[in-house]
A protein has these predicted regions:
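Boundary/entry segment of secreted carbohydrate-active catalytic domains
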Residues: 48-79
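Aromatic-rich peripheral "rim/lid" segments of glycoside hydrolase catalytic domains that contact
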Residues: 279, 293, 298-323, 327-375
Length: 375
């Protein structure tokens, strides 16, 4: 009897492992490695430009707020709108975050629509970053929006779907359909806590992600479907990356692009990032983007007593970005698709990581993307 029970248990484990292997194989099949071309505004008759080999991007979610205060950005001593400076220096994508009812952060739907319109007019492609929160969303803070806080799981799933669909519809109707949509921000620990908190609630988390993905797809109307990015904060950690994306695939969450944050004081060395890029490319066979990065241009305590890999100077900052771009481009099978700098125009405590000095003059790092395109 016990032998029969053991054989039954052993056979059950074998079947479960086979199911997981099949699901993982399904998830790792390439969905096409080309990031789609920019979608022209409905008021523009010209065809979209051919997709560049590499994404040179920036999160510019604070820019409009800063310029509305009268801050003027300069390049070589000449004042220009911030977006024009970036475009002139080789940037080709912008990332915009969207929150539900942010206070005091500015990133409402209307604010983001204005940013998107200005960016698209200059030829930028758009990555829209849904936080699904009223405040910052990151692995330590994934607070459910106040208006959704008391919803049971089923209602929360509906709210995520409708909010995402309505937002994408508004962008589409304005003629600024996003090229890529990020469902959640640094969601290594889940999102919309406590309902979608990991590691304990994978099924609920998967439901929430799928609701956002369906909302993005249904909001597109007749436009091309935006690529779906899933973003975590494990640039130099292949072990946690494997845990997260393997579970995502087993839970059958469809996605197109892997996004990683990489800040060297938190996520390790460039060599650790390189190893993880190789791991992701070989295991998941999907495009990979370092969707958040930065480096200080003046002394700071970010490394907490450890020696920084580059000097914390304007030139050291530029050297870091140049080496990061090279590292991502070396990803196997051409799957390293881009880099986004997190907030080139910033104030306060994070100004030391921006691309402009205290007088709002462009630092050497602004030139790195343009130089990389000439190599």
């Amino acid at each position: 009897m016990y032998r029969h029970l053991f054989l039954f248990w052993k056979w059950g484990c074998y079947v479960w492992l086979m199911i997981c292997s099949v699901l993982l194989a399904m998830g790792t099949q390439s969905i096409g490695q080309t990031i789609p071309p920019a979608q022209a505004s409905s008021s523009t008759a010209s065809a979209p430009a051919k997709q560049p080999y590499f994404i040179y991007g920036a999160d510019v979610s604070f820019l409009q707020q800063m310029e509305s205060k009268g801050i003027a950005f300069k390049d070589n001593g000449q004042v220009h709108p911030g977006l024009e400076i970036l475009r002139h220096n080789g940037f080709n994508w912008v990332r915009l975050r969207i929150m539900n009812e942010p206070t005091p952060l500015p990133n409402t739907l209307q604010y983001s629509l204005v940013e998107a319109k200005a960016a698209r007019a200059l030829g930028f492609r758009i990555l829209l970053d849904f936080h699904y929160s009223d405040d910052w969303a990151d692995p330590a803070h994934e607070k459910t929006p106040a208006a959704w806080a008391k919803m049971p799981h089923e209602e929360l799933v509906k709210a995520v779907y409708q909010f995402t669909k309505d937002t994408i519809t508004a962008f589409r109707e304005q003629g600024t359909m996003p090229d890529m949509v990020q469902i959640g921000n640094e969601i290594t620990s889940g999102m919309l806590w406590p309902d979608g908190r990991l590691p304990d609630r994978w099924p609920q988390f998967a439901d929430l992600l799928e609701a956002g993905i369906r909302g993005a797809n249904d909001g597109k109307g007749a436009e091309q479907r935006p690529l779906i990015m899933i973003h975590i904060d494990q640039g130099g950690n292949d072990e946690t990356t494997k845990w997260f994306f393997d579970n995502l695939i087993v839970n059958r969450v469809p996605f197109d692009v892997i996004g990683q944050s990489y800040y060297p004081w938190w996520q390790g060395s460039l060599n650790e990032l390189k190893n993880n890029l190789e791991f992701m490319a070989n295991r998941y066979k999907k495009p990979i983007i370092v969707v958040e990065t930065a480096y200080d241009w003046r002394d700071s305590e970010d490394f907490k007593g450890r020696k920084p890999p580059y000097t914390q100077t304007p030139q050291g900052q530029a050297d870091f970005l140049g080496m990061l771009v090279n590292t991502v481009k070396q990803t196997p099978n051409g799957l390293g698709k881009g880099v986004f700098w997190w907030e080139p125009m910033a104030e306060g405590a994070i100004a030391k990581r921006g691309m402009f000095d205290d007088h709002h003059e462009a630092l050497p790092v602004v030139k790195v993307f343009g130089s990389a395109q000439q190599q």
